[in-house]
Curated annotation (Swiss-Prot):
Presumptive replicative helicase. Has ATPase and DNA helicase activities. The latter preferentially melts 5'-tailed oligonucleotides and is stimulated by the SSB protein (single-stranded DNA binding protein). The active ATPase sites in the MCM ring are formed through the interaction surfaces of two neighboring subunits such that a critical structure of a conserved arginine finger motif is provided in trans relative to the ATP-binding site of the Walker A box of the adjacent subunit. This is Minichromosome maintenance protein MCM. A motif (Arginine finger) lies at residues 472-475. InterPro entries: AAA+_ATPase, MCM, MCM_C, MCM_dom, MCM_lid, MCM_N, MCM_OB, NA-bd_OB-fold. PROSITE patterns: MCM_2. It comes from Saccharolobus solfataricus (strain ATCC 35092 / DSM 1617 / JCM 11322 / P2). The lineage of its organism: Archaea, Thermoproteota, Thermoprotei, Sulfolobales, Sulfolobaceae. Changing A416R: Predominantly monomeric and loss of helicase activity. One of its GO terms (cellular component) is MCM complex. It is an enzyme of class 3 (hydrolase). Changing D191R: Predominantly monomeric and loss of helicase activity. Gene3D superfamilies: 2.20.28.10, mini-chromosome maintenance (MCM) complex, chain A, domain 1, Nucleic acid-binding proteins, P-loop containing nucleotide triphosphate hydrolases, Winged helix-like DNA-binding domain superfamily/Winged helix DNA-binding domain. GO terms for molecular function: ATP binding; ATP hydrolysis activity; helicase activity; identical protein binding; single-stranded DNA binding. Homohexamers. Forms a complex with SSB.
Length: 686
């Protein structure tokens, strides 16, 4: 039964709760917390709602239904109790907070209604915008400018100053009206910060925009979370109007939340709920010796073929193991790039990945700016306040960032993902806001060939509109070519079977697969065995040895690919929920790395593997030809002001360089700023 709060002295009930409530270990739970609060001069006492409910149902009812009235009463009682324990506490801390956690009333952002206003509720979401910290007056000190008074007083007398600054009309000391002057040095201030919380991407209904809610953080809650953090906020819903309320004002108000407590999710993928039954099913699946192949078969099962690519996408979904060292952090996420002819189902596969991944953000290159991908400082039109706003890579922190048509991005926007892909952070310094946000996400991107279809005779850097600085950051690159052949009948039959509703056998349903991936990412951190370590080391050393056989040998592999091998090996182990990376995992990782190097990292002229095709965009053979042409330009420019094109062509052909290659290299060098056209058809080295 409801009991109005005025019939009970909740101060006494609350103090009795704090001093007598015992936890599971039969210890005075809150006495210990209060002692710690006093000793370390903290400002907040965390109270579990379930404890209050088991102690006094009436107090629990008032806390969640009459929060605006009851919370200041409880905070006042707590402060008085602390001063009895330690009177010196007042010298350091003027205000103490009661933070209630574990509220049963958890509401989805899009289901907030007017009936929730004034009540204590909990909301899950992502923090997308944060303002710099400001100061709010919660107790102003005024001076009455009147010859008969001139006294100072605090205002408001019995409560806190609301969001809009109030001035007294009559002096509480002398009872007369007059002029009142604010005394800033005696006014009490509190740290204040505005933020915006948004629905999590996986909760937004298809075809709808994510809902947002403005939240207010005060005192020790400011800067407790950063844009991109997944948070659980508990607070009181209230209403406000942008402009002062006056006659003729619109009778429509915005809802905002004054936060009582905020919990930043430290757990990986805690939005995926895995029951005991799910866990048993996952462990049973992992016992299947062919589980990896079953998982790969379950990736975009409606798309025919592309086994190696699906294998790589599965590896990216599981990821490796990130390592945090004293001076750096080594990423565990696996980045994948798909370059494919039109109609090879690139976008379909990316869409599937965004659905099956426990946490994913899908975006397209054409519709993405640098700010939209990483972070931005945004100015609000109404108030002129600056917000730090998180972009797609920050929102995908801990999951997968899916970027379709990455080749369509503008160069100035594409540069923004360099740091996010390797360091997995996003740094921003604009409008006085300097921040570094986490972007610990695997990037899976797709793009179309520059010339419409992939030209096998050209290196990968010539086939896609991406600079080598980005290409080199992808662990694996796959090329999908639409080539007519013997498999066309099988392809046609497969597509017709899909359209006729025939299901593919032996695949794992999408919901189970999502939970399996979440479980592996959350709980499985395999260690590399000495056998696997030796196999990876031998492969790396053997490839490097081939690079040093002759002075003309290209570089076959770099330490960047070695790190990728380790990540891929760990991902194979995670797919089977294994605690160790075995020889089999290392062998599979080496096979897929070798496939990548032999299909993408090949110098088309020599036919040899040359990792510089990806790392720098120019294989060793092209670099050597470029150096010869530079020497020719230097020697020709000695006798005259610059080297004429016809003379360069003549001398370069004499040393065995084809005319078409010479013209292409001259164009590339001019674009790169190595040479410039001093006169028409006459070049000089910069």
């Amino acid at each position: 039964m409801e009991i109005p709060s005025k019939q009970i002295d909740y101060r006494d009930v609350f103090i009795e709760f704090l001093t007598t409530f015992k936890g599971n270990n039969n210890q005075n739970k809150y006495i210990e917390r209060i002692n710690e609060l006093v000793a370390y001069r903290k400002k907040s006492l965390i109270i579990e709602f379930s404890d209050v409910l088991s102690f006094n149902e009436n107090l629990a009812y008032e806390i969640i239904n009459n929060t605006k009235i009851i919370l200041p009463i409880l905070e006042g009682a707590l402060y008085d109790h602390i001063l009895q324990l330690d009177p010196t506490y007042q010298r350091d801390i003027e205000k103490v907070h009661v933070r209630i956690v574990g509220i049963p009333r958890v509401i989805e952002l899009r289901k907030i209604r007017s009936t929730d206003i004034g009540k204590l509720i909990t909301i899950d979401g992502i923090l997308v915008k944060v303002t710099p910290v400001k100061e709010r007056i919660y107790k102003a000190t005024y001076k009455h400018i009147h010859p008969d008074c001139m006294q100072e007083f605090e205002w408001p007398e019995d409560e806190e100053m609301p969001e809009v600054l109030e001035m007294p009309t009559i002096c509480p000391k002398c009872g007369k009206p007059g002029q009142f002057r604010l005394i800033p040095e005696k006014t009490k201030l509190i740290d204040w910060q505005k933020a915006v919380i948004q629905e999590r991407p996986e909760e937004v209904p298809s075809g709808q925009l994510p809902r947002q809610l403005e939240i207010i953080l005060e005192d020790d809650l400011v800067d407790s979370a950063r844009p991109g953090d997944r948070v659980k906020v508990t607070g009181i819903l209230d209403i406000k109007q942008d402009s002062p309320v006056k006659r003729g004002s619109r009778a429509v108000f915005d809802i905002y939340m004054k936060v009582s407590s905020i919990e930043v999710s430290q757990k990986v993928l805690d939005e995926v709920i895995i029951s005991e039954e799910d866990e048993k099913k996952i462990k049973d699946l992992a016992k299947d010796p062919w589980i990896r192949d079953r998982i790969i078969s379950s990736i975009a099962p409606s798309i025919y073929g592309h086994w190696e690519l699906k294998e790589a996408l599965a590896l990216a979904l599981f990821g490796g193991v990130p390592k945090v060292l004293e001076d750096t952090r080594i990423r565990g996420d696996i980045h994948i790039l798909i370059i494919g002819d039109p109609g090879t189902a690139k976008s379909q596969m990316l869409q599937f990945i965004s659905r099956v991944a426990p946490r994913a953000v899908y975006t397209t290159g054409k519709g993405s700016t640098a700010a939209g991908l990483t972070a931005a400082v945004v100015r609000e039109k109404g108030t002129g306040e600056y917000y730090l706003e998180a972009g797609a890579l920050v929102l995908a922190d801990g999951g997968i960032a899916v970027i379709d048509e990455i080749d369509k991005m503008r160069d100035e926007d594409r540069v923004a993902i360099h740091e996010a892909m390797e360091q997995q952070t996003v740094s921003i310094a604009k409008a006085g806001i300097v921040a570094k946000l986490n972007a610990r996400a695997a990037v899976i991107a797709a793009g179309n060939p520059k010339f419409g279809r992939y030209i096998s005779e050209r290196p990968v850097s010539d086939n896609i509109n991406l600079p080598p600085t980005i290409l080199s950051r992808f662990d694996l690159i796959f090329i999908l070519k639409d080539q007519p052949g013997e498999q066309d009948r099988e392809l046609a039959n497969y597509i017709l079977d899909v359209h006729s509703g025939k299901s593919t056998k032996n695949i794992i349903d999408i919901d189970t697969l999502r939970k399996y991936i979440a479980y592996a990412r959350k709980y499985v951190t395999p260690k590399i065995t000495s056998e696997a370590k030796n196999l990876i080391t031998d492969f790396f050393v053997e490839m490097r040895k081939k690079s040093s056989e002759t002075p003309d040998s290209p570089i076959l592999i770099t330490p960047r690919q070695l790190e990728a091998l380790i990540r891929i090996s760990e991902a194979y182990a995670k797919m089977a929920l294994k605690a160790e990376v075995t020889r089999e995992d290392a062998e599979r990782a080496i096979n897929i790395m070798r496939l990548f190097l032999e299909s993408v990292g090949v110098d088309m002229e020599s036919g040899k593997i040359d990792i510089d095709t990806i790392m720098t965009g120019k294989p060793k053979s092209a670099r050597e030809k470029m150096m010869k042409i530079i020497e020719i330009i230097d020697s020709l420019a000695v006798s005259s002001e610059c080297a004429k094109v016809k003379d360069i062509l003549k001398e370069a052909q004499q040393v065995g360089i084809e005319k078409s290659n010479i013209e292409k290299l001259l164009t590339d060098m001019r674009k790169s700023g190595i040479i410039y056209e001093a006169k028409p058809e006459c070049y000089k080295k910069v």
